[in-house]
């Protein structure tokens, strides 16, 4: 199915009779979206420009750790995707390069604000809300209610039935912790997380791991970005999603050029390409259903309808701070991660 989508997209991208471009060097990319989307970017960009894309797959937290470790000798040129908070933290730590794209005016306001907030060291490429994923067949078979609120997840009926990622490695889970802190206040949020721990079967490394486990029937529920639900449903899995009534946060998936990039010109070329409406269609073609940042990009009907979701006024500046991230993760590891299983 993905191969068929790729062939269609290639046909749309290439001019009639166009030949594959000649070799024009390379660009080294950390990719923090799902593998099918990363692979499509790699194939289409290489075929259309002649620039080889060398991919490294990392979750957002892992990507930030890699860039920090490589600060003195960067091996990465561009970081594509993943939650925006770590991109802001990379900008604050001078790991990424200031670059003002001439395409900024074509983007939604939230994508432009992400760029301005980082002093133009990152930019929004998509957005997606946080919520719950569930296996419809497993929920029915176990006679479990569908949760509608954050508070519902504390129901003892869900003991061992929920998966969520670890905020130290996953931007999804960090967004969850930050969202709860803003909804409840930090002290109540950590009391909530400690109570929720009793119902968690596993803390995964990757933010998409829990909803994939839901799809496979390994767990009934996940805390996930809700745009990941249609990805699994499109493959025939019995997955549905819901956003909590109390309110929820949303990520601004971002893209950054690494300071000290060895292939800077090619990184800028990929950056500009990724902001075009045409390139942003590859997300839906790869069955990834975030809201694209380019206003001219056609929106797939499976993309969550933000107008129907109660979104909090997420403080991207505060939770995009490197010090705040370190503090919150350290507290989570001490107060929640260290609890007995």
Please state what every model-predicted region is.
Residues 22-89:
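Early extracytoplasmic/lumenal segment of secretory-pathway proteins
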Residues 258-316:
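Mature extracytoplasmic/periplasmic domains
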Residues 314-341:
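Conserved C-terminal helix/tail region of periplasmic/extracytoplasmic solute-binding proteins
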